[in-house]
Amino acid sequence: MADFDEIYEEEEDEERALEEQLLKYSPDPVVVRGSGHVTVFGLSNKFESEFPSSLTGKVAPEEFKASINRVNSCLRKNLPVNVRWLLCGCLCCCCTLGCSMWPVICLSKRTRRSIEKLLEWENNRLYHKLCLHWRLSKRKCETNNMMEYVILIEFLPKTPIFRPD
């Protein structure tokens, strides 16, 4: 029985090495940055809907634009409420010793989760079939030292056909 476990571990190591080798050859992810004029806790009020040239041949520009529009509509729905609570929280911050900022933090977290769920739905619906994976990621801004949320479009390695499931 111990020999069986050792063989299993060797096969597992081979699979892990093969996956790492496939990840080495995948191209750099595409970054879709926020292009809005309002940013609350690093989350912009809209993302760029311009089709990146590196996705040519992978996904249709119409599908890309539809996905970005879904994310932007989610932001359009949630962000005005967050801004109102942020202004209210800033006005009352001194009186409440900072506790008035908690609703803004919770609403911001809820907005991020709803976008992550939307991106996961998009991945399951379309993009995983095209060997792409969309996710919300925190990155450093190009212009200053602050952090911002961006959409990363990663290229998934194709699984070899000759390997059984």
From Swiss-Prot:
Keywords from the UniProt entry: Coiled coil, Golgi apparatus, Lipoprotein, Membrane, Palmitate
Motif interval(s): CHIC motif (Cys-rich): 88-106
Membrane topology (UniProt): Peripheral membrane protein
One GO process term, biological-process aspect: Golgi to plasma membrane transport
SS bonds (residue pairs): none
Modifications after synthesis and translation: Palmitoylation in the CHIC motif is required for membrane association.
Cellular component terms per the entry's GO annotation: Golgi apparatus; Golgi-associated vesicle; plasma membrane
Subcellular location: Membrane; Golgi apparatus
Pfam families named in the record: Erf4
Coiled coil residues, start to end: 1-26
Main location: membrane
Family affiliation: Belongs to the CHIC family.
Name of this protein: Cysteine-rich hydrophobic domain-containing protein 2
Lineage: Eukaryota, Metazoa, Chordata, Craniata, Vertebrata
